[in-house]
Amino acid sequence: MREHFNDGVEFARFLAHRFVTDKAPNSAAALTYTTLFAVVPMMTVMFSMLSLIPAFHGMGESIQTFIFRNFVPSAGEAVETYLKSFTTQARHLTWVGVVFLAVTAFTMLVTIEKAFNEIWRVRQPRRGVGRFLLYWAILSLGPLLLGAGFAVTTYITSLSLLHGPDALPGAETLLGLMPLAFSVAAFTLLYSAVPNARVPVRHALMGGVFTAVLFEAAKTLFGLYVSLFPGYQLIYGAFATVPIFLLWIYLSWMIVLFGAVLVCNLSSSRLWRRRSLPKLIVLLGVLRVFLQRQQLGQSLRLTHLHRAGWLLPEDEWEELLDFLEKEQFVCRAGGGEWVLCRDLGAYSLHRLLNRCPWPMPSRERMPASLDEAWYPPFQQAMERLQVEQEALFGESLAHWLADGTSGAKVT
């Protein structure tokens, strides 16, 4: 029991470190800023899509009210009134205004994808038709799915009202769980579809459940904070709704991005996190496995790498592949597999060290031992290199920068 608790604490610390390293708070701030401009366009698009289907006619306002009642703290009621007014006015725009709203909505989706790709270490975002189709699917299918879900909710409610509470056993419980179910579905779809990387559906679902529960808890606590500590009302008066709503949007994006960090790192094993090998060592180990597979006439995928003892998670694998593909070491073989397509006999380690984006590890970060035949001579060479560097550059800066030193001068 204690071991599981320690593992949980270790994993939580690891997630917190990754959350900060991936600049998630900065991304949440950028998304908050973008949301201010995109919330009205997104709602306008939602109403437009729902109005195309007669069965969903007039349901947009009901969905908007449902969202604000269940996903925004009570302090957002005033904002809801303003947004309804803005959305009503936006429906009377000319085609130029409609295009501007669509571009604004797409900009928000681009910012979300950029933040997720940063977390998943994806350096090559979607481009062209693939990106457009994804965004169009979100903007078009999202409102339709919301409309369908809300229609089911309305049907269950009306059935209970007309035929009594016994018409559908558990209807009250089901209706109470609908907001949480919508949140789980939305977050699961977000985590599985938006990153330009392979995300296991099981991990996306686990992250969706975690984020939805955390979101509900945060909504309750935020509502209590606003009601018990009305400092914003005292300072801003009638305008207090604006900073409170901004703070809630920022907190919401922080929760969403933390859930993304969780989903991304569910594939990382406890053993791999504890080893914390320098990225250069991992790169050489991966190249060694590629070479072995090439000699056998076989391609390589992440599962093969795991069987060889390199248990790196999906995001690190994608990051290494990005570098290896740019340097023309590997090529796609189809089916998610890769092959070595460069003669390693014509590529020196010195060149790799110069081209590698990750720094050479210090002596303290080098593992004492590694079950790889190439590692002992590499370790000795790195130690010799660091000894020579210390001998060459061990003098103080005052020695190097003073007049008349033996250091080289630029003329």
Swiss-Prot record:
It is found in: Cell inner membrane. The chain crosses the membrane at residues 36-56, 92-112, 132-152, 174-194, 207-229, 244-264. Pfam families: Virul_fac_BrkB. It is a multi-pass membrane protein. HAMAP family: UPF0761. The lineage of its organism: Bacteria, Pseudomonadati, Pseudomonadota, Gammaproteobacteria, Pseudomonadales. This is UPF0761 membrane protein PA0951. Its main location: membrane. Belongs to the UPF0761 family. Keywords: Cell inner membrane, Cell membrane, Membrane, Transmembrane, Transmembrane helix. Coiled coil: none annotated. GO terms for cellular component: plasma membrane.
